[in-house]
Amino acid sequence: MVSALLRTILVTGGAGYIGSHTVLQLLQLGFRVVVLDNLDNASELAILRVRELAGHNANNLDFRKVDLRDKQALDQIFSSQRFEAVIHFAGLKAVGESVQKPLLYYDNNLIGTITLLQVMAAHGCTKLVFSSSATVYGWPKEVPCTEESPLCAMNPYGRTKLVIEDMCRDLHASDPNWKIILLRYFNPVGAHPSGYIGEDPCGIPNNLMPFVQQVAVGRRPALTVYGTDYNTKDGTGVRDYIHVVDLADGHIAALRKLYEDSDRIGCEVYNLGTGKGTSVLEMVAAFEKASGKKIPLVFAGRRPGDAEIVYAQTAKAEKELKWKAKYGVEEMCRDLWNWASKNPYGYGSPDSSN
């Protein structure tokens, strides 16, 4: 990779689940990192732990509590130093909440991104890696999902991702100096192997495995499985689960692409998944095996809006980013349990809001 030394990367949402794992990898590679996060759905403790894990590179991390909609604060940060690139994770991400509070999501995710892009443009910073999502595929009629599959977000959260993708495409079309990579994640799972950082959803979890984790540590009595009559191997929904460390690697690969292929990059999109589908019951069984815990199940009807089968075609990322997921479901569940057993209340405590 082009030498990381003296390169400073701005990471928005860097205190969050995927952000914190990516920040750690950047530090370990020798980058300087400035993290911006408003801590709405993240904990500053994640940043403190990333510092500890980074060892002698900890001093290369600078944290600022900032909301991306605060243009004046952003402008001051960009005026104070030069950023080689921006990795943009920041945003609200609970699908269910987005249906109940659409304006909150449009305001936070869209206005925050517009403000960020305006300030980047004003300061001549035109390299961007953006966290998009497989939610932009909606309910795919065919799997695996390729980067050319039809886009049809089914909820306000997914629509914010799709609008931002379009915004990035329009931005590059208007000014080819912009070099942008859009990463469509599938379902992140697991934690850093140290068990020191991991997923800590403030409030109610949004995804399957944090629910499983809460049942395993005694915070919930049972896991509710929604839908047992899908046309799948065991009747439950199938998703493409990917280890968060593999996802972090994908961001490093995207950053490398922005540097090394700068002349050929426009606004590119890549799926980040394993290319394999795993059912809800298969994930539960793998977690039970990894943890030695029995997860009581309650079966319920399908939830409106849940797709039957979603998994990625990953050939483009493998070919162009030289990236491929290394870890399987067993490692995801092993590392998730290592984190959950050491941090049953995430970064909080039993009497905190977590």
Curated annotation (Swiss-Prot):
SUPFAM superfamilies: NAD(P)-binding Rossmann-fold domains
Catalytic activity reported: UDP-alpha-D-glucose = UDP-alpha-D-galactose
Keywords: Isomerase, NAD
Active site positions: 157 (proton acceptor)
Cofactor(s), names only, from the UniProt record: NAD(+)
Residue sites binding substrate per the record: 133
Known EC number: 5.1.3.2
One protein family per Pfam: GDP_Man_Dehyd
Record-linked InterPro entries: NAD(P)-bd_dom, NAD(P)-bd_dom_sf, UDP_G4E
GO molecular function: UDP-glucose 4-epimerase activity
Entry keyword NAD: yes
GO biological process: galactose metabolic process; monosaccharide metabolic process
Residues involved in NAD(+) binding: 8-39
GO cellular component term of the entry, any: cytosol
Pathway assignment: Carbohydrate metabolism; galactose metabolism
Function: Catalyzes the interconversion between UDP-glucose and UDP-galactose.
NCBIfam families: galE, PRK10675.1
Sequence similarity: Belongs to the NAD(P)-dependent epimerase/dehydratase family.
Name by which UniProt lists this protein: UDP-glucose 4-epimerase 1
Native organism: Oryza sativa subsp. japonica
Gene: UGE-1
